[in-house]
């Protein structure tokens, strides 16, 4: 009987050992299955994140193209600072240039490829870069005193035989530039003495003639410009007023001599 009891205990021990082994194997299998699921979850999550990033990049890309098109339609020539106001980065502008959608006119100014080119595109870029963050309509609404003047203004208004460039601009403050094709002169220009041409503030013929004298241009060319303007409705009274305002000293009066003679004021 004792021997039977011992055999029974030994059998139960073996059964318990088998149960433990099955439980251990089951636990290991469950753990491995859990690890596999976790790895699959991480991979799936990573794939979704990559797709999301790709989607966002594509959306940003098309958003930049749309914004650039809108800015170009509004401004024609536009600046890096104007683009930044529409959340268009420098990288996006550089990419558009490489892709052939944009043309770089000068440092910080662009135009859309395929649009009609104008002789004044470069001049427009230089003017906009004097206050790069503001749009043309904003500067037109609030006059800042910076205008195209002198020989450049005369060319734009077909007065005399002057070239468009080197470009000449007038500003109420001193503006320095290293660009050899652009010069600034410090002078006060009244808003009443400018006209907007091709999106640019240009001195009217009366003010342009006075500036040509102050810039020491050839007197014969000034008279030619005067005659051209006279045939297109020159405001001689306004011209007389401007000449008088700029003839306060003997030196200034000497500079104004071509116009004083033409107006019969000498």
For each feature predicted by the language model, list its residue ranges.
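Short, intrinsically disordered or compositionally biased N-terminal tails of bacterial proteins
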Residues: 2-60
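Short gly/ser-rich loop at a beta-strand->alpha-helix junction or flexible surface loop bordering the NTP-binding
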Residues: 41-44, 48-66, 72-81, 85, ...
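Long hydrophobic alpha-helical segments typical of transmembrane helices together
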Residues: 249-266
């Amino acid at each position: 009987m004792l021997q039977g009891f011992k055999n029974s205990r030994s059998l139960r021990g073996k059964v318990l050992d088998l149960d433990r082994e099955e439980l251990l194997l089951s636990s290991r299998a469950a753990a491995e299955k859990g690890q596999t699921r976790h790895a699959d979850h991480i991979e799936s999550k990573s794939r979704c994140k990559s797709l999301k990033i790709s989607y966002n990049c594509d959306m940003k890309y098309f958003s930049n193209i749309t914004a650039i098109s809108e800015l170009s339609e509004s401004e024609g020539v536009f600046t890096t600072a104007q683009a930044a106001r529409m959340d268009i980065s420098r990288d996006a502008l550089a990419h558009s240039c490489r892709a052939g959608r944009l043309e770089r006119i000068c440092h910080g100014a662009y135009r859309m490829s395929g649009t009609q080119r104008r002789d004044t595109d470069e001049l427009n870029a230089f003017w906009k870069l004097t206050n790069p963050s503001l749009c043309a309509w904003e500067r037109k609404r609030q006059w800042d005193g910076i205008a195209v003047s002198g020989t450049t203004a005369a060319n734009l208004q077909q007065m005399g035989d002057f070239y468009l460039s080197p470009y000449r601009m007038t500003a109420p403050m001193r503006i320095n530039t290293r660009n050899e094709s652009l010069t600034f002169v410090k002078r006060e220009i009244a808003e009443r003495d400018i006209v907007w041409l091709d999106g640019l503030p240009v001195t009217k013929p009366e003010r342009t003639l006075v500036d040509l004298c102050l810039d020491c241009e050839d007197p014969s060319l000034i008279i030619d410009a005067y005659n051209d303007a006279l045939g297109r409705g020159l405001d001689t009274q306004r011209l007389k007023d401007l000449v008088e305002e700029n003839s306060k000293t003997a030196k200034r009066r000497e500079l104004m001599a071509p116009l004083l003679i033409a107006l019969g004021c000498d």
